[in-house]
Amino acid sequence: MPALRSVLLLCWRDIGHPQGGGSEAYLQRVGAQLAASGIAVTLRTARSPGAPRREVVDGVRIDRAGGRYSVYVWALLAMAAARIGLGPLRRVRPDVVVDTQNGLPFLARLVYGRRVVVLVHHCHRAQWPVAGPVLGRIGWFVESRLSPRLNRRNQYVTVSLPSARDLVALGVRNEQIAVVRNGLDEAPASSLSGPRSGAPRVVVLSRLVPHKQIEDALEAVAALRPQIPGLHLDIVGDGWWRQRLVDHVRRLGMSDAVTFHGHVDDVTKHHVLQSSWVHVLPSRKEGWGLAVVEAAQHAVPTIGYRCAGGLSDSIVDGVTGLLVDSHAELVDRLERLLRDPVLRDQLGAKAQTRSGEFSWTQSADAMASVLHAVQVGEFVSGVV
């Protein structure tokens, strides 16, 4: 088997982007592990205000240009120009290209053919309406019809079995879908020995965007405050929806019971998790739910919606956390966990044990095996 020498990663954001989240962390961590193994890794992505046009992060060479949507145009032009020795990617000679489809593909197939792997964390049907009626319909058409047809001879990678099933529903052949699950950054040792809060604290670890449905967590805490004195909600993360949530908290009359921490460093994040009793992830769609396993490191169980897809993989229902089917059930299960320390501790202990099964080294090794297969014209399917 020929050596894998160079990989080009395409993603609309990188981990340093103000709106970067779990999917960007996945690509950066896997890319860093591949780079550490001697592979030349280049990430082409958008350029946020203040970000350098080029830099190297953890061995990954990052090349930035374009905004939220123009990133796709500039990346396609850069790839096409590189084929004739021009442009910012002219020195990149990838053996394999990873086209990360966060709703929209980079159309790398048009330039690199079968050497392209399409990485899909989850399908975006539930999120496209936020883009407006016209753009939303166009986006969903591209994601659900155009992309599967264009990439019908390409390898797909996703991060959970539910996401793989969603791809099959869009017409992608199961034989072409590999599942490479998320890894996990180890929690700082100092954060694992901190005390649990004496008063009941619920945490949400998430980007603040509409499809994460943070309002559901706010309303659940508001409903339970009269029955559970001292109940407090910590929201770790930021996003363009933040002010809407702050206003919602004010309307609920519970500004003193909610803390918006914003973007914080890893040590602070893990100290907040360590002090929490329960983690709530009310998102309407998740590819995997990295926050679930981050909370699990601290023996904090997660409650999430079954319909979110990937949470059915990251949460083992009734073992490491709880899956619910409605907001009313979310409120009911949250109250149950807050009132039942035995159940809470049992779920948390099993969640913590399971968190030890995941690492970025393992994820990168799995991804590398898929990339090697693509390099020689083969497909990989199932959990790798």
Language-model region placement:
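Nucleotide-activated donor-binding/catalytic signature segment of Leloir-type glycosyltransferases, i.e.
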Residues: 246-264
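Aromatic "clamp/platform" in nucleotide-sugar-dependent glycosyltransferases that forms part
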Residues: 284
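Conserved donor-binding/catalytic core segment of Leloir-type glycosyltransferases
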Residues: 157, 193-221, 234
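Membrane-proximal helix-turn-helix segments that form the acceptor-binding/catalytic region
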Residues: 134-157, 165
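A short, well-ordered alpha-helix in the C-terminal region of glycosyltransferases
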Residues: 230, 343-357, 366
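Conserved acidic donor-binding segment of nucleotide-sugar-dependent glycosyltransferases
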Residues: 316-328, 336-342
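Short hydrophobic beta-strand element within catalytic cores of glycosyltransferases
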Residues: 301-305, 315
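Carbohydrate-associated surface elements
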Residues: 162, 183
